[in-house]
Amino acid sequence: YKITKININKDEQFEDKFKKISPFSKIPVIIDHEKNISLFESGAILIYLAEKSEKFYNLNKRTIINQWLIGQMAYIGPMLGQHHQFHHYNPGKSKFGEERYFKICERIYLELDMRLKDSKYLAYDEYTIADIATFPWIARHDWHDIGLKKFKNLSRWYNDISSRVCVIKGFDL
């Protein structure tokens, strides 16, 4: 694979060349040169790569995997993203926004912790694309000012995933 970095701090994602492969001007995007296709949106990319590699997406368990993957795409990511906007990037500009998204963020941590009480990973005991999609949001726990210590199961999950060689390599890209 080849990595092309898009500098979102310089608005490179809004350039016409990039918008042709990502109409919403969002990262990530992949191009599969073997099949001559490009894909945008994390969930679509993860499903595509998992099906292509036959890893992290057990077809017999895809219903539960999809449920947690889409939960991340529709709820966890957007809500933690809003928390980042109000709490990390623009503190002091909206007390309502900061308080609202802090509470939602805390609730997400609690909900994930409860789920992980009953299973090693989000979709039972297999590491899947649902975990891959959710992990980067929890990896920003220092931005959330909640702390992982009071969430025993979420902490275990986070520590397990953060010690994986491929995850370490991915964060170093």
Can you say where each PLM-predicted feature lies in the sequence?
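GST-like domain detector, emphasizing the conserved glutathione-binding G-site
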Residues: 1-100, 106, 113
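GST-like fold's C-terminal all-alpha helical module
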Residues: 68, 72-166, 170
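Proline- and acidic/polar-enriched loop/turn elements at helix boundaries
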Residues: 5-8, 61, 128, 153, ...
